[in-house]
Amino acid sequence: MAEAYIIDAVRTPIGRRKGALSQEHPADMGAHVIKGLLERTGVDPEAIDDVVFGCLDNVGHQSGCVARTCWLAAGLPESVPGVTIDRQCGSSQQAVHFAAQGVMSGTQDLVVAGGTQQMSQIPIAFAMIAAKELGISDPFTGSKGWVE
């Protein structure tokens, strides 16, 4: 089995709720980190097999596949796919694990892993109530298998 290595790590500054970073788009924050990573390592963006990002509550500016949105916001090749993981507080850590598994399985060689989240714009657990206007009070109501 192939081994997986972390070749570098970059992060944004730690923000505060309603602080200096509160108006930054989560994709722009992720793009900033990805660009910094590629500049520091000299890795050719075309050599990247996948972008795996964690993000809690994929709604608003964080909706869709924010991993790919970050990549594209960085001005990088459209040929590189992305996937976003929501494992609550462990989302970015899970992204790193999935990236390592892709390399260890031999299906990928280079994967960018990380995460982005804008809690000043999207309050924690907002995704749980985001569909109220559609008549969906929470993700559980109406499920025959959900036990209260």
Where do the protein language model's features map onto the residues?
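Conserved PLP-binding active-site segment in aminotransferase class I/II-type PLP enzymes
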Residues: 3-8
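Short glycine-rich or small-residue beta-strand-to-loop segments that form or flank ligand, phosphate
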Residues: 51-55
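Acyl-thioester C-C bond-transforming condensing/cleaving domain
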Residues: 1-2, 16-47, 60-66, 71-148
